[in-house]
Amino acid sequence: MQKWNRHSSLAASAMVALLVTGCGGGGGGGSPTGQTYSATCADGSGKTSTVSAADAAAQCPTATYSAICADQSTVTSNTSQAAANAKCTPGIVAKVVASTYTGEKLAAFNQLNADRAQCGFGQLQQNAKLDVAAQGHADWLAANPFLAASHVQDPSTGKGVVTGVQRQDRLQNAGYIPTPWVNYLGTFSSTEVIGVPAWGTALSCKYCANNASFGNTELSVGNGVRQLYATVYHLVDILKGERDVGFGAAIADSSIIGVHTRYIKKVVIDPATAQGWVRQSIPSDTILTFPCQGITNTTPVFRGEDPEPFPSRGSKEYGQPVYVMGADGTTVTINAASSSITPLGGSPVATTVFNSAVDPLPPTDGRNVKNNQVFLVPTQRLLDNTTYTVVLNGTNTGMVTNANPSGAYSRTFTFSTLTPTTF
């Protein structure tokens, strides 16, 4: 798998443009020089005045910025989109309209939303325009299977229908964000995650040594979601606070891929938040985890991802990461000495803490983990069909109070793995 910038935010604002024009002849009233002052307003309309440029600008309609909060309430501001967004209190989406998906897409959508809701990340709403963008990219990847999980549609391959070279292009072409960017007063954010859930008997990746337990071929979109859970960067993306989502899935032509069955299925998930909608968020004194209490059927093997968070790992198998997230702007830590992941009736597994301090991606790379994101990662494969108890101890700057000056937190919960051959 490969991933794109973890958060892409674009904004544009229209400015009032003033134009002074000279007029011939004399006359009373208005400008003593006969000048006409023009103003181009933020909404594209024009106003004129014979008094002054300020008077022309004052005739422009007042812009109103609106935002739809996570609780579905609407707030407005005459100042800016950011000011409108700031009026929303932190919150998550508890319920969405039933999707129109069928088959494996429906199962995967329901699974993702159920898991997000169970762990407190909030649900995503199906968006038909994002479906178009995601399906278009899945189809292009299926026509270009050896590009694995590229986020760029290269027209020079001559294969498949190019629906947008970059992710932003695909969202624009699908109508999710404006084209062109004229008088665009808001912001949008989006992430694209791509899963390749097929493995088959011809395992050809460096992570596949000793992975016979992956079984033969598993092509479901739901398995693609589960494999995205067993990652670091992609797990962050699939649990981000976006409002909408689109699913795409396609199977490559077997005559192209030959025996390399790991390239056969492409699953594209496009979470995003459109202009005028506010992303889901949590209060500063809150932490969320994934897995969380009661999550089942997680993949016992960390299968690697691109970019690779553990460059020195080589082909060594790791286990399902445990993700801890605080609110934006906070710093969250895990105390490795007092945190553990333990199988029922067994001993704690070896783990490592992954955070922004050890992330191999530089701070300038938008895909890197942030200070409010930290992982406890098993440095060995977890057992199939096994219940694990997770004990987490650490700190969260958003939880600092007089009674809790260090911002300490403690969490204990259980989750379980599945047997990969029974996906």
Where is each model-derived feature located?
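Bacterial N-terminal signal peptides that target proteins for export
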Residues: 2-12
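Bacterial Sec-dependent N-terminal signal peptides
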Residues: 12-43, 64, 74-76, 91-95
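Functional surface patches built around histidine and acidic residues
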Residues: 34, 64, 81-340, 369, ...
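A short, exposed loop/beta-hairpin motif centered on an aromatic-Gly-Thr core
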Residues: 44-51, 72-79
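A signal for long, low-complexity, Ser/Thr/Asn-enriched, surface-exposed stalk/shaft
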Residues: 52, 60, 78-81, 85
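Secreted, short cysteine-rich peptides and small extracellular cysteine-rich domains stabilized by multiple disulfide
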Residues: 56-59, 68
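Acidic, low-complexity Ser/Thr/Gly/Pro-rich repeat segments typical of extracellular/periplasmic
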Residues: 309-423
